[in-house]
Amino acid sequence: MNEFQDIKDDFPIFEREINSKKLTYLDSGATSQKPKTVIEAMNNVYLNTNANVHRGTYVLSAETTQLYEGVRNKCKNFLNAYHSDEIIFTKGATEGFNFLANSISKKLLQPGDEILLTEIEHHANIIPWQMVAKEYQLEIKYISVNENFSIDLDELKQKISKKTKVVSITGESNLSGLLPDIKLIRSIIKENSDALFIVDGAQLVPHRKVDVQDLGIDFIVFSGHKLLGPTGIGVVWGKLDILNELEPVSGGGDMIEEVYYDRATWAPVPHKFEAGTPPYVEAIGLGAAIDYLENITMEKVSQHSDNLRKYAQNIFSDLDRVSIIHTNEEFAGCTFSMHVDQIHATDISLMLDTYGVAVRAGHHCVQPYHRKLGIDATFRATGYIYNDENDLDVFKDALMSSIAMLG
């Protein structure tokens, strides 16, 4: 049985037509579409159990709290984490990186310590570090990306040192589809420093089976809306012993143990990092998204992504005038950023929309690397579980027609 053959039927959005044409959605790198089960799970809370979590002794609150905390355990199993207390809920991956950058810098780093990033990172994994580097007198170093859009591991070995305290890299590039060898990078870090290893899982977690114990990393960050869940929910996983060392960076209700007029003490991990009313309905939607993916199995999701990528590489290989930013590594994601000589990416995207094809145009929050390439913007096609070979064929034909019309 092919689990993906009729999968669009699970997603109400695909009942829409765009400009009298079937929707061809190739922008899952920005956000995924949502299956009916996720929408229904969230509606069920509002219709039947809605109440604030952790704070009520009545039935509705107890039911909602059980659903909400149950998602923490689902995330633990989904990542093969050591303990559900290692799962920190945030409002997204960006907030997750801001939390880590501020909490780690505040508690564990000293002036002159170094942070290593790659030059192909998303802004969410650059700007928070820039902000804390300025505040705490830290130094950021960048690892180059080679002509194949892969991380230069020789340069990593040269730049990492005992002064390196944080290495934070993408698990899957939202620009080129690069899937770095995380375990190899982990071994390089261990040989040369005691740095914390953080992985940006925003693109990785929706497409690959992630086992944090096997990878040997210290933290991973991802958002719910890219893996079939709603906006407004994200996850930081971190090793419990490290989380216990960190201080909260946001204060308020639900993260405290005792409050006095002149001081306060914190609740245990994970709650000390989750101030205020949490996005409990969004978390429950994330849990339904995880259930949906695990019903398929992440192994099959990964294989589908690989099959799409290989087909795309084949049909895109002869595109006239089109330059493609995509790694040629054996393992990569189904993410293709492109530009056409003498035609702006936004014009291409607007023209593709007339054919019902949805792609992203811009710098995809990887502006420094676009600048290095001398490109103002690209348009990007990203595939997911509800895409098939026909979607890629429609995209290619629409792209060729768009180029012909735009000159």
Regions found by a protein language model. Give the residues of each.
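Pyridoxal 5′-phosphate
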Residues: 1-407
